Amino acid sequence: MPTPTPKKVTEIPTIDVVLVVAATESAAYALDTASEIAVEPQVEEEEAVRLVVKGKLKAQKQKVSTITGNQITLTDNVFSPELVQMLQGGTIKYWQEAGQETEGTEDKGFGVSSYTPPTVGSGIHGSVFTLRAYSAQYDTSGQIVRYECIEYPNCQGVPVAFASEDGAFRAPEYTINSAPKSDEAPYKITYVSTLPSVS
């Protein structure tokens, strides 16, 4: 059988973590301060089976790998209480006036006064959300021509820990597990001309 003539592949060079959006049905939060997203596929493996008779391989069944989701590690450069609340639950309180003397749960534009995680053993978890990570595609003139969006479904965060050191701004790492539903892809890549608007 003749070999088909090779066709040049589509080349899509992307760079940077331009924007990250975490969205539930009732809220969406955008981060333009994230510096890295590492994704590790979660794979269940069925080991290979080989029939070896007197030192000779007679037959074999290849190893089967099944993807069950992705573990996403998001490195941010600032603390984002709204994202942390989405990841692990808890309560955010806001200053209710410019003098910053009274706390409340309504954001009136005077800033965050506190974040408290769920109590130990409460069984409270964060929300299930969709994560969209945007990267930029540049042309040879150095201009952005469009954006790549990778969407991960059914994301849930794990409890967050914080570390600090002298002379360095904190760069929190958030671990997120994404597990698709039955007949759902573990991620989807789309290309868009503009980023979503952020208020």
What positions do the PLM features span?
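Basic/polar low-complexity intrinsically disordered segments
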Residues: 28-30, 122-124, 184, 199
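Mixed-charge, glycine-accented linear interaction segment located at domain edges/termini
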Residues: 146-199
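A general secondary-structure signal for short beta-strands and their flanking turns/coil
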Residues: 12, 67-71, 126-130, 145, ...
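Extended, acidic-biased charged interface segments
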Residues: 123-153
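Solvent-exposed edge beta-strands and adjacent loop segments
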Residues: 2-89, 154-168
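Acidic Ser/Thr/Pro-rich low-complexity disordered segments
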Residues: 25-29, 134-146, 191-195
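Extracellular-facing segments of soluble proteins and assemblies that are Gly/Ser/Thr-biased and enriched
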Residues: 65-132
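Exposed beta-sheet edge/beta-hairpin loop segments within beta-rich domains
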Residues: 64-65, 118-123, 139-142, 160-171
